[in-house]
Amino acid sequence: MIYAGILAGGTGTRMGISNLPKQFLELGDRPILIHTIEKFVLEPSIEKIVVGVHGDWVSHAEDLVDKYLPLYKERIIITKGGADRNTSIKKIIEAIDAYRPLTPEDIVVTHDSVRPFITLRMIQDNIQLAQNHDAVDTVVEAVDTIVESTNGQFITDIPNRAHLYQGQTPQTFRCKDFVDLYGSLSDEEKEILTDACKIFVIKGKDVALAKGEYSNLKITTVTDLKIAKSMIEKD
């Protein structure tokens, strides 16, 4: 089975424009989270869309689904997320297992709730690549020169941009593989390895690159929200 896992566990209100976490802010005529879920509803191969939300916001998320996506709510599961990204993925997988016991071939397409401009093509590419690889990471080519500084004051290296990519989401992999690999990490490794695909890489698994889009914006600042609103208005 193919599942979607939407990471919506953040509680930050650092934009300073609302008491709502950013995934619940309005973008056009509906919340950012709803825009994101709608993109996954369009892919018929996805059995369930599981949304990991902070415990304080589960009821709010359920109300939004009832209001904006009543025809699709049977395909959507709202569950309590974890304390961080990877524990939220683990909670999402636990919710999948509760719905239907996991098999070794079950795949989860994980995605940031605040990336509402994901395309159906990106979702389908992730699913297709995951059939033949251990994991998939969605990326775009780096367009700016990246500099490295080990002390925050002076440049220590300027890597070759031709070999660099900017990571986005979705990130896609088999549910059981993630659970096994995450479970094999020490507590110290769990603190450091906050990116799911990095866990696969350091464990020697093959992680394929899926082509992202520069429009696959992650809305984390007021400027991002302004850009997103202008993108919605153009559509």
Swiss-Prot record:
EC number: 2.7.7.40
Keywords: Cell wall biogenesis/degradation, Nucleotidyltransferase, Teichoic acid biosynthesis, Transferase
Annotated S-S bridges: none
One Pfam family per UniProt: IspD
Molecular functions per Gene Ontology: 2-C-methyl-D-erythritol 4-phosphate cytidylyltransferase activity; D-ribitol-5-phosphate cytidylyltransferase activity
Chemical reaction(s) catalysed: D-ribitol 5-phosphate + CTP + H(+) = CDP-L-ribitol + diphosphate
InterPro entries in the cross-refs: IspD/TarI (IPR034683), IspD/TarI_cytidylyltransf_bact (IPR050088), ISPD_synthase_CS (IPR018294), Nucleotide-diphossugar_trans (IPR029044), TarI (IPR034709)
Site (Transition state stabilizer) residue list: R14, K22
Site location (Positions ribitol 5-phosphate for the nucleophilic attack): R161, K218
Keyword rRNA-binding: no
Biochemical pathway: Cell wall biogenesis; poly(ribitol phosphate) teichoic acid biosynthesis
Binding-site positions, CTP: L7, A8, G9, G10, G82, A83, D84, R85, N86, T87, S88, S113
Gene Ontology annotations of biological process type: cell wall organization; isoprenoid biosynthetic process; poly(ribitol phosphate) teichoic acid biosynthetic process
Chain's role: Catalyzes the transfer of the cytidylyl group of CTP to D-ribitol 5-phosphate.
Similarity field: Belongs to the IspD/TarI cytidylyltransferase family. TarI subfamily.
Name of the molecule in the record: Ribitol-5-phosphate cytidylyltransferase
Organism per entry: Streptococcus pneumoniae (strain Hungary19A-6)
